[in-house]
């Protein structure tokens, strides 16, 4: 009887050790955030950089003037006009008079969603045709634009 208890304990310990060794490293909650949720159809959200309760919301602007342009960004678009500092998410009405920053004289700027990266407080897009890598980041009070421009000879 004692042998069966010892073997059972060893077996359970081995199974627990096996599952523990096979588990993945724990993820940060930030790794689970997808800023692109709600940027299509009629969600009226934007994927740009923002801090919780932040004063600025840096994001690309892909269209203007109609109901689908309420947040300034719509996932179905493949061109963007530039980047602005104030966006409201999910409002359903065009509500801000944004000042547009353009990293290139070309308008509109073509982009691919595979060249976009977004996480809380950060957004980047590679505008390949214009030769520009645009990065946006925020703190609670400040927004920073970085545009790396490739100059061909």
Model-identified regions with their sequence ranges:
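Bacterial N-terminal signal peptides that target proteins for export
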Residues: 1-11
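The feature marks either
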Residues: 17
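C-terminal motif of bacterial Sec signal peptides marking the signal peptidase cleavage site
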Residues: 20-21
């Amino acid at each position: 009887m004692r042998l069966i208890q010892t073997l059972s304990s060893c077996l359970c310990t081995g199974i627990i050790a096996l599952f523990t060794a096979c588990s993945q490293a724990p993820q940060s909650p930030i790794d689970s955030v997808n800023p692109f949720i709600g940027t299509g159809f009629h969600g009226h959200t934007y994927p740009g950089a923002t801090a919780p309760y932040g004063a600025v919301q840096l994001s690309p602007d892909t269209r203007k003037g109609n109901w689908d342009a309420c947040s300034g960004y719509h996932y179905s678009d493949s061109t963007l006009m530039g980047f602005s500092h104030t966006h409201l998410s999910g409002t359903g009405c065009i509500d801000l008079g944004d000042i547009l920053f353009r990293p290139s004289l070309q308008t509109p700027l073509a982009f691919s969603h595979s060249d976009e990266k977004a996480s809380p407080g950060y957004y980047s897009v590679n505008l390949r045709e214009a030769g520009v890598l645009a990065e946006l980041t925020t703190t609670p009070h400040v927004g920073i634009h970085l545009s790396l421009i490739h100059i061909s000879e």
